[in-house]
Amino acid sequence: MRKSFYTWLMTERNPKSNSPKAILADLAFEEAAFPKHTDDFDEVSRFLEEHASFSFNLGDFDSIWQEYLEH
């Protein structure tokens, strides 16, 4: 079974980094409502588009998701 996207993303936290992946990891960590137990692209993407209290470049999200799938 694949790790949830959130669990995988948390391994990329680095407040000193300017990489999109580290930025998203830090934002997701601070977002209490972020979907933590899913590996479903649509669920995470929909959350980022409609419910997140922060904005994030969805093109960068697509690239990060692809890296998650290749992990």
UniProtKB/Swiss-Prot annotation:
It comes from the Bacteria. HAMAP family: UPF0346. It comes from Streptococcus pneumoniae serotype 2 (strain D39 / NCTC 7466). This is UPF0346 protein SPD_0837. Belongs to the UPF0346 family. NCBIfam families: PRK13672.1 (NF010193). Disulfide bonds: none annotated. It holds the Pfam family YozE_SAM_like. Gene3D superfamilies: YozE SAM-like (1.10.150.260). InterPro entries: UPF0346 (IPR010673), YozE_SAM-like (IPR023089), YozE_SAM-like_sf (IPR036806).
